[in-house]
């Protein structure tokens, strides 16, 4: 319409196939993930809005809804981190943002360059010496089960702006240089998801 707002009504009971209990939530989840856009620094944002009304005879299940909402928040947080330009999300800022995840129940430990040297993490420190920014190792912990349960561990590399090693990358690849921290961003999004869902895992 003239206001840039579209409305869709979906009546799930008219679908002539047997749907599993969380199929409706999966459908909405997919729509929300598809609607992601990183427009934080755009002066003119897309004003178009799509409102979806899901009509069903089945009772609303908040537990299932919250599960998919937590997944969405984790995925989109990862996308936000990867999409940030290198002059904004440098190692100092990245470590600062990860520290803020304490608010959702994660245990966050940040080790700076001085501590890394004591720990013998010389390869990590060596890579970081190519930047005026600090080097950090950040651990995120979620304990949703008994303390004696075996933990799952995920490791991700977080080079915020990778210009190359022995050979510098040409300028035409500059927009991709922030993607070298995507591995760590995926781990961060996963940990946020686990914490928001109160997952029974360590």
State what each model feature region is.
Residues 1-160, 173, 193-197:
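N-terminal hydrophobic/helix-forming segments and targeting peptides
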Residues 166-202:
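Acidic/histidine-rich catalytic neighborhood of metal-dependent amide-processing enzymes
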């Amino acid at each position: 319409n003239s206001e840039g707002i579209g409305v869709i009504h979906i009546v799930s009971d008219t679908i002539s196939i047997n749907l599993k209990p969380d199929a409706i939530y999966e459908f909405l989840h997919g729509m929300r993930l598809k609607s992601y856009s990183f427009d934080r620094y755009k002066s003119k944002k897309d004003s178009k809005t799509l409102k979806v009304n899901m009509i069903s005879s089945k009772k609303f299940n908040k537990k299932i809804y919250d599960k998919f909402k937590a997944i969405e928040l984790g995925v989109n947080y990862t996308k936000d981190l990867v999409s940030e330009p290198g002059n904004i999300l440098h190692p100092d800022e990245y470590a600062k943002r990860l520290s803020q995840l304490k608010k959702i129940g994660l245990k966050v430990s940040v080790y700076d360059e001085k501590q890394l040297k004591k720990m013998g993490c010389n390869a990590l420190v060596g890579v970081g010496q190519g930047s005026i920014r600090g080097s950090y190792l950040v651990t995120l912990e979620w304990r949703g089960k008994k303390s004696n349960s075996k933990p799952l561990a995920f490791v991700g590399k977080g080079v915020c702006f990778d210009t190359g090693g022995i050979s510098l990358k040409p300028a035409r690849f500059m927009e991709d240089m922030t993607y070298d921290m995507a591995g760590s961003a995926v781990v961060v999004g996963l940990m946020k998801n686990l914490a928001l869902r109160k997952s029974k895992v360590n």
